């Protein structure tokens, strides 16, 4: 089912009309196809809100569990033509299954990522749609939100750099490393959204990830007071990034 690495016995695949679901039975043992529909949670009074972006992320509170439900949507010009549909090749290459399995592997390795709960694709002819459910992290907010609220300490910037380096040392190339996909809590830094991410040998792409993050930081702070993001802050992040984790290979 994984194609590249072993999944634990708690991971199951179930067929649904026109597609399949992949899920962790320890987190979603009674998974239903309806769980991927926001209106289902709304009808039960368990939809807590939503975060808008390229694709809405819905916040769900199910019993004692807090989850994020996301429907895959295109960005840019392609969104005008296909919105939420992607070219079908095979099950393994569907965006929800690929992201779920990579996130599963990262979480199992102890990296600061949300635990994957379930993923689904539905195939129709030569295209498919997809959805994913992940754990909602107990965070203060995204890096963007925190910067809008006030300046961050140099210790926080160093921690952000260290976090990114942990992923890069293990060859995790984040396809969209930006200020929205870095989450902060009182004690931890997390990365989210591993759609289209790849495992690669560390190389020039690592610098490309950092350049992308820098552009994002400049974009989200350009209208804010200048002390919200300074050169000293960026150098603090780079100082943290230079502190290698020493781990260079993900466990199988």
Where are the language model's segments positioned?
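AlphaC helix of the protein kinase catalytic domain
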Residues: 142-151
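Conserved catalytic-core element of eukaryotic-like protein kinases
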Residues: 173
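Hydrophobic residue at the +6 position relative to the catalytic HRD Asp in the kinase catalytic loop
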Residues: 177-184
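Conserved ATP-binding subdomain of kinase catalytic cores across diverse folds
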Residues: 33-141, 165, 169
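Juxta-kinase regulatory segment immediately upstream of eukaryotic protein kinase catalytic domains
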Residues: 1-48
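Generic detector of well-ordered alpha-helical packing
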Residues: 71, 136, 177, 194-196
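C-lobe/activation-segment region of protein kinase-like
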Residues: 190-252
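Conserved alphaE helix
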Residues: 155-163
């Amino acid at each position: 089912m994984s194609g590249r690495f072993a999944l634990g016995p708690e991971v199951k695949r179930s067929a649904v009309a026109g597609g399949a679901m992949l899920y962790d039975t320890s987190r979603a043992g009674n998974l239903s196809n309806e769980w991927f529909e926001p209106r289902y949670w709304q009808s039960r009074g368990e939809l807590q809100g939503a975060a808008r972006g390229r694709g809405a992320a819905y916040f769900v509170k199910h019993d004692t569990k807090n989850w994020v439900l996301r429907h895959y949507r295109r960005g840019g010009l392609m969104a005008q033509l296909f919105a939420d549909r992607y070219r079908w090749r095979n099950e393994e290459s569907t965006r929800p299954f690929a992201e779920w399995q990579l996130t599963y592997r990262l979480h199992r390795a102890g990296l600061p990522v949300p635990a994957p709960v379930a993923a689904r694709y539905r195939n129709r002819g030569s295209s498919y749609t997809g959805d994913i459910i992940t754990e909602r992290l107990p965070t203060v907010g995204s890096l963007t939100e925190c910067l809008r609220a006030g300046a961050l300490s140099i210790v926080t910037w160093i921690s952000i750099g260290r976090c990114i380096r942990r992923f890069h040392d293990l060859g995790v190339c984040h396809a969209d490393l930006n200020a929205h996909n870095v989450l902060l809590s009182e004690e931890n830094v997390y990365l989210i959204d591993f759609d289209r991410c790849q495992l690669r040998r560390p190389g020039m792409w690592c610098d490309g990830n950092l350049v992308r993050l820098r552009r994002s930081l400049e974009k989200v702070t350009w209208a804010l007071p200048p002390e919200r993001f300074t050169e000293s802050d960026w150098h603090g992040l780079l100082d943290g990034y230079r502190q290698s984790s020493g781990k260079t290979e993900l466990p199988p």
